[in-house]
């Protein structure tokens, strides 16, 4: 096996991509150069788990579409969140990432699926490209991710290749700039002109077309979270109110009306406001009778027991057995993993959490690899099909401090 480059040399390789410019985070290395090498059977098992989980969410969307009372009675959505869901008419999917774990008992479990604004694509593709030569006897499972993403966009646009697109993202936050850059590269390489901007740069021209910086576009690639378009709600009783709690009413209604009129396509669709909500996981367990027999079996197989905190007696939740998750937290944000926190911190979290915004999910043990690291293997679903892998390694919960590693499959 060729010797891996030292980290300084690797950092220069990353800088050379002109996409990833932060190989260190707070002075710590962000990446592990030694790849996670899956056997073919492990890779197949992960893909086989991810696609049924995508189908579970598809059924869930149909269930909520047929039972709109759940928007109030179960999810307790805000008015603008309900507007997003109703305008989308059940459409929620373009690209998603299912986070999977190989467990001590040999099973595969999923803690959640990011169906709203999944990230990590640049790291998944570029790390594999740069480090694959140092992993002979393996294949790179991410080589087709860009083309799969493009074909999904074409399909969403009525099987017509978009000529002008905008990537809408929170321009004041730098975390996902590499993903914005690689999306832009993928689209421009296929002849699509790309403009980048924030929701505040949206407008309409005289013909009713959506514009970004006054340039008309036919496709919006949305990397601005659904819960940020709507009313911002606090999730802790001791949390300060948001300074910008009001919905982006002008910008959101502009897009919803334009899409309803067939003037623009938004990917991911705004229906992700329901599937991204962690209460979806609770619906799977609290109302399994609403799902097909096959989906119900998949829920039991892959989704840890999840309940609304408002439906539980919080004083009976044993810290060692449960994980608390907020409704729209992602990437480890607003997650309290019981076994990893002190009893006093667990009690404080339960006391401060506003129950209607939280779920409790059964804790499960992840099989560690070397250095006691626990892999979180994200499987990208594009159009419902497994399309690539994104691996993060951590000793406890997966959060922003997790180390990213390339993912390969042994030949």
Label every PLM stretch briefly.
Residues 1-411:
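Preference for protein termini
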């Amino acid at each position: 096996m060729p010797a891996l480059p030292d980290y300084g040399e690797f950092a220069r390789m990353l800088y050379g991509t002109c996409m990833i410019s932060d190989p260190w985070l707070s002075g710590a290395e962000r990446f592990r150069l030694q790849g996670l090498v899956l056997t073919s059977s492990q890779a197949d098992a992960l893909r086989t788990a991810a696609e049924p989980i995508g189908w579970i969410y598809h059924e869930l969307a149909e269930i909520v579409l047929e039972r709109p009372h759940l928007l109030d009675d179960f999810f307790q959505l805000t008015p603008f969140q309900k507007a997003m869901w109703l305008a989308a008419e059940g459409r929620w999917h373009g690209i998603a990432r299912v986070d999977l774990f190989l467990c001590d008992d040999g099973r595969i479990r999923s803690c959640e699926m990011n169906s709203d604004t999944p990230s990590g694509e640049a790291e998944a593709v570029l790390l594999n490209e740069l480090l694959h030569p140092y992993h002979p006897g393996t294949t790179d499972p991410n080589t087709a991710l860009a083309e799969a993403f493009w074909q999904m966009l074409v399909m969403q646009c009525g099987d017509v290749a978009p000529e002008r697109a905008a990537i809408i993202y929170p321009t004041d936050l730098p975390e996902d700039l590499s993903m914005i850059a690689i999306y832009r590269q993928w689209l421009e390489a296929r002849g699509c002109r790309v403009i980048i901007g924030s929701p505040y740069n949206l407008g309409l021209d005289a013909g009713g077309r959506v514009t970004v910086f006054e340039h008309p576009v036919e496709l919006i690639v949305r990397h601005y979270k659904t819960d940020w378009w709507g009313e911002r709600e606090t999730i802790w009783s001791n949390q300060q109110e948001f300074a910008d709690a009001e919905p982006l009413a002008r910008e959101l209604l502009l897009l919803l009306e334009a899409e309803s009129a067939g003037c623009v396509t938004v990917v991911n669709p705004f229906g992700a406001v329901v599937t991204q909500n962690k209460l979806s996981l609770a619906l799977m367990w609290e109302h399994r009778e609403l799902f097909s027999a096959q989906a119900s079996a998949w829920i039991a197989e892959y989704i840890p027991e999840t309940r609304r905190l408002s439906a539980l007696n919080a004083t009976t939740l044993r810290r060692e057995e449960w994980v608390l998750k907020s409704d729209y937290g992602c990437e480890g944000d607003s997650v309290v993993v019981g076994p990893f926190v002190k009893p006093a911190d667990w009690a404080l979290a339960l006391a401060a959490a506003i129950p209607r915004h939280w779920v409790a999910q059964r804790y499960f043990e992840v099989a560690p690899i070397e250095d006691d690291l626990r892999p979180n293997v994200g499987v990208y679903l594009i159009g419902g099909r497994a399309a690539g892998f994104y691996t993060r390694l951590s000793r406890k919960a997966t959060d922003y401090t997790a180390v990213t590693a390339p993912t390969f499959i042994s030949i």
